[in-house]
């Protein structure tokens, strides 16, 4: 058998770090992938690159390979390694060859340790109304299966029934232990993380734990005061608009905001004064009477002053 020069195959130096080797592997894997490459020997080159990566990507295997490469001209190495059959060494021969040259203890010491599986993140959209109480949700996601080279080989569809707790906030992460990818060599599974995304609401804006809603009122309602029906996340309430209210004024409704374990926010009604359509002759006359009665009022009196 012939001991291959994995560094030459990858186009890297023995002193290069793993990041450099990984970059080279990805470039060569794309270049020689049988599905995309037009090279006549693409499949063989792809397998050769994958074999080199399998050894050089593992710190312990790489150290053992370097030791074997260093001893490749030693008589003991040649007796144990070369059989005169013209075959080439590959990664599957590693255990037998290495242990025969350097001892059974070396073989046992290079067994890969248990490795934890990968975590998975998926985004879960939640409506504002759903944040008030715990609710059940069926979620579907794809569970990736990795090959020996750390590449996704396939994706397995998976469905779970989960509970979304009350009071979740935008960007909050919920951990589902052990629902990620399987561990290796007896290692624990990774976790599934649900990342909460609060869906935009047509009426409410979120400000911390509080909610804001724009309430349209007429000029006379703002001037004289009135009561208007305003929706909340649970039910509608009757909101008092005090006389002399201004555009942009915020009226607080206590305890009608978002709910969490620590506190309940408030709802703020932001007044928006809406003018009626272009007035007819009679309406214009009424507006003129109002203007005459308030002739001393200058809305721009303090405009631009600090």
From Swiss-Prot:
GO molecular function: bent DNA binding; unfolded protein binding
BP-aspect Gene Ontology terms: chaperone cofactor-dependent protein refolding; protein refolding
Gene: cbpA
Location, primary (coarse class): cytoplasm
Gene Ontology cellular component terms for the protein in this record: cytoplasm; nucleoid
Species per Swiss-Prot/TrEMBL record: Shigella flexneri
UniProt keyword annotations, A-Z: Chaperone, Cytoplasm, DNA-binding
The J domain, residue ranges: 5-69
Protein known as: Curved DNA-binding protein
Organism domain of life: Bacteria
InterPro entries for this protein: DNA-bd_curved-DNA, DnaJ_C, DnaJ_domain, DnaJ_domain_CS, HSP40/DnaJ_pept-bd, J_dom_sf
CDD domains associated with the record: DnaJ, DnaJ_C
């Amino acid at each position: 058998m012939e001991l291959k020069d994995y560094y030459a195959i990858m186009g890297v130096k023995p002193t290069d770090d793993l990041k450099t080797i990984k970059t080279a592997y990805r470039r060569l894997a794309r270049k020689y992938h049988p599905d995309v490459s037009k090279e006549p020997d693409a499949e063989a080159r792809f397998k050769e690159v994958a074999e080199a990566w399998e050894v050089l990507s593992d710190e312990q295997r790489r150290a053992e390979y370097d030791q074997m490469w260093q001893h490749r001209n030693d008589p003991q190495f040649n007796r144990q390694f070369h059989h005169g059959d013209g075959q080439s060494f590959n990664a599957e021969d590693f255990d037998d060859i290495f242990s025969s040259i350097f001892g059974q203890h070396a073989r046992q010491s290079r067994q890969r340790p248990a490795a934890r599986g990968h975590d998975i993140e998926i985004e879960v959209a939640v409506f504002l109304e759903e944040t008030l109480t715990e609710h059940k949700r069926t979620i579907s996601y794809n569970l990736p299966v990795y090959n020996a080279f750390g590449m996704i080989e396939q994706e397995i569809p998976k469905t779970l029934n989960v509970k979304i707790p009350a009071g979740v906030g935008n960007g909050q992460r919920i951990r589902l232990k052990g629902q990620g990818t399987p561990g290796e060599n007896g290692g624990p599974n990774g976790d599934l993380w649900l990342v909460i995304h609060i869906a935009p609401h047509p009426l409410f804006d979120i400000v911390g734990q509080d909610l804001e809603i724009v309430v349209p009122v007429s000029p006379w309602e703002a001037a004289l005061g009135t009561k208007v029906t305003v929706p909340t996340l649970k039910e509608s309430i009757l909101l008092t608009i005090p006389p002399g209210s201004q555009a942009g004024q915020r009226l607080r409704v206590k305890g009608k905001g978002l709910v969490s374990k620590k506190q309940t926010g408030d709802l703020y009604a932001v007044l928006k004064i809406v003018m009626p359509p272009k007035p007819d002759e009679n309406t214009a006359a009424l507006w003129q009477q109002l203007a005459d009665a308030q002739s001393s009022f200058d809305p721009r009196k303090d405009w631009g002053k600090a």
